[in-house]
């Protein structure tokens, strides 16, 4: 199936769940728990073994209900592999101009990683749909609020260290979306296939 990014779905619940390094065999149960828990957007990082195959499988398993994207995209080869696999949005760790420009050309939403005001504005000027502020926990919600003062036009996606307790603070600070990895996808629980726990965890973040 050919999936596409749905802004309406994303804006209704602007949380990106970040999957990094989980084996393919866990994907069906994991995605089912995420769906039941109410989350709608999942990023599979390209430094996961077999990432392209996982993205393709995720789109086939859940692409009608979940928005599936690729993270940690570091070059054009990785971008092409992710898009061929069916990723509908792209996240980069840094302001990678060739990747951003290619995404803009192909009308694929791209969320580049940046930290300083100069990097953030540069990513936005290149055509970023959102700018991933990483690592967000270095500055916390106060940093997001400070960035929004001179850069209110830039949509920010703080990522890194955001947990259930701090999420509301980031939203109040002006975050337009939130990226969550480890605090949502606890490795020990997932490897143990504790899907009821994951469903409840996703529901807690979604609410």
What are these regions (language model features)?
Residues 1-88, 105, 153-156, 164-165, ...:
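Conserved N-terminal beta1-alpha1 strand-loop-helix module at the mouth
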Residues 38, 62, 86, 94, ...:
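Conserved functional loop/turn residues at catalytic and ligand-binding sites
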Residues 46, 72, 93-95, 114-115, ...:
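Short secondary-structure boundary segments
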Residues 75-85, 118-126, 143, 162-178:
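Catalytic cores of alpha/beta
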Residues 89, 93-138:
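Histidine/lysine/aspartate-rich catalytic loop segments that bind and position anionic ligands
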Residues 89, 93-99, 133-141, 175-195:
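Glycine-rich phosphate-binding active-site loops on the catalytic face of alpha/beta enzymes
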Residues 99-103, 121-126, 141-146, 166-169, ...:
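Short, charged, surface-exposed secondary-structure boundary motifs
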Residues 103-104, 110, 141-151, 156-158:
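CoA-thioester-processing core
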């Amino acid at each position: 199936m050919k999936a596409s990014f749905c802004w309406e779905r994303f804006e209704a619940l602007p949380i990106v769940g970040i999957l990094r390094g989980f084996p393919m065999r866990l994907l069906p149960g994991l995605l089912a728990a995420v769906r039941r828990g109410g989350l709608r957007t999942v990023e599979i990082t390209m430094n996961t073994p077999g990432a392209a195959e996982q993205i393709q499988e995720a789109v086939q398993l859940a692409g009608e209900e979940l928005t599936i994207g690729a993270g940690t995209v570091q070059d054009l080869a990785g971008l092409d592999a992710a898009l061929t696999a069916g990723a509908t949005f792209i996240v980069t760790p840094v302001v990678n101009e060739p990747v951003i420009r290619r995404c803009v050309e192909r009308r694929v939403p791209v969320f580049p990683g940046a930290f300083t005001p100069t990097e953030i504005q540069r990513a936005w000027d290149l055509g970023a749909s959102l700018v991933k502020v990483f690592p967000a926990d270095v500055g916390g919600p106060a940093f997001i609020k400070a960035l929004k003062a001179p850069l209110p036009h830039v949509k920010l996606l703080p990522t890194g260290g955001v947990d259930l307790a701090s999420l509301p603070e980031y939203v109040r600070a002006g975050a337009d979306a939130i990226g969550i990895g480890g605090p949502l996808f606890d490795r020990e629980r997932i490897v143990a296939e504790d899907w009821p726990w994951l469903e409840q965890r996703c529901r807690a973040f979604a609410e």
